Amino acid sequence: MTYSIFDREQLVIGGLNERKNKVIFERDMVSLLQKPHAFSQEGTHLIERTVERIRVAKEKKSSVMLTFGAHTIKNCMAPVLIALMKEGWVTHLATNGAGIIHDWEIAFQGQTSEDVRANVERGQFGIWEEPGFYINLAIIVGAYENLGYGESVGKMIANEGLKIPEISTLYDTTTQYMESDPDKAAAAIDLAGTIKRFGLKAGWMPIPHPYKKYSVQYQAYESDIPFTGHPMFGHDIIYTHPMNHGAAIGRTALNDFLRYAASVVNLEDGVYMSVGSAVMSPMIFEKSLSMAQNLKIKEGKHIDNHYILIVDLAESDWDWQQNGEPPMDHPAYYLRYCKTFHRMGGEIHYLSADNRDFLLALYRQLKGEK
């Protein structure tokens, strides 16, 4: 059968300087001094319980994982996320592909979030040169360097540029690793092809990021804390650019999934917080926990004393901890981010809250403030 393939080379790609953004970081950022809206008695108790469990996890050197959707970045929560990292309250951060992109755009230009409706109408949504070129190139270079998805972008932001290898070096790498590490050999070929196709020069490519102090993945890279990216093909604006390369996405995203799974292995007595992620977080967690349990069972152990808190705006009148899984004719059964996590054992709670209020309240209580 013959199928049509969309030719991205035919796209008219705009520059970010042409794009109007809805979020200006220095105008909209959430300050550590800002107070959250008041919670109900039940919500306050849940946050206190979470703080208690984080303190225990920190004492026992167990994982404290914070996984979130892109709106946590778009809501300018970087100051809180960075403080949680720097003060040792979280050991792993994870987001989807959009979260990586919004964080990069903030580091690169201090603003993010285009008008989707208007730009789709004019055939321009997501079709921008800088994020498409630089983020994809960072991932292609990162695949060659055996980095993770988030790590590749964080390194580019931290160094404010990328090192482009000589073509001859890449060909030598291909020959050297063809049998011992075919993935690395393939990544070298991919990078060589990209360099030739786009006419890139070997050596240092400067890419200024004047707002990098606001980047969560930059701060994670500098602090040597995993910030993993978990993209899905076709979900993000970088897929519109001809620089996009599926093999590099796959190699770096797989590295990040395995790093995420390694943190789940250390989740006994630990804490997992899923904030505003209806699909990505529960899906990668269930596979990772199964893998982790597999290893623990081999050692005669089991992960049982883990704490899970799910935070989302949607209201839920079902008590998952007390009532278990609802019947299939109940709407709560179809809340994937509750149902999946409830099947993962441990202690699980659901909190209906805005991510800004939750993270601010969590941080303030960890600091001993009200």
Locations of regions flagged by a protein language model:
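A general structural motif
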Residues: 43-48, 208-209, 231, 246-265
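Short glycine-rich or small-residue beta-strand-to-loop segments that form or flank ligand, phosphate
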Residues: 62-71, 93-95, 271-278
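Ligand-binding beta-strand-loop-alpha-helix segment within the catalytic cores
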Residues: 115-223, 228-229
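C-terminal functional extensions of proteins
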Residues: 250, 259-263, 269-271, 278-370
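N-terminal glycine-/serine-/threonine-rich phosphate-binding loop
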Residues: 2-82, 90
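Short gly/pro/ser/thr-enriched loop/turn and capping motifs at secondary-structure boundaries
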Residues: 98-103, 235-238, 281, 315-317
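Glycine-rich phosphate/diphosphate-binding loops that line cofactor/substrate pockets in enzymes
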Residues: 48-63, 219-223, 262-269, 370
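Active-site histidine-anchored catalytic micro-motif
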Residues: 75-77, 82, 86-138, 211
